[in-house]
Amino acid sequence: MEQLIIPAIIAITIAFFSVYGLTPFVIRVLEKRNITVVDANKKEKTMVARPGGLSIIVGIESSLIILYIFFPISEILAVLLTTFFAFIVGLIDDKKTMSGWFKPVALAFCAAPIILLGAYDSNLAFPLFGTVQIPLLYMALVVFMIPIMGNTINS
């Protein structure tokens, strides 16, 4: 158990400080280049820098890389790649709005690392029926959930 705590603390610390340190820099650069939008959550017409996801993705990816160094398993690599690909789709969508059908399809392809690296467990445990193995259901669930989450986070 102790061997899991130290890598987790290192990953969390790196993620926190990379986001905390990089966010003001990203905001300054975006404001300097006049890449801002009106904040829809304020009564005043306050301008905010966009896209701000760069500092967040650096924090996520850096922590996943640290975890992968300590634990080189396919599940971490799959999440790392899927997150990065989804970030690229979101960045493209921020720069040039994608059509209604294209963004979900592009995000569905981002699920490929999870499926190709087998980073899912196809065993379902039902209290009444016991354990059932349905691999196609899990693959379909992954392909549908990545676009849903991607659209929820980056809408």
Where are these regions (language model features)?
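"…together with the soluble PPM/PP2C metallo-phosphatase catalytic core" -> "…together
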Residues: E2-S155
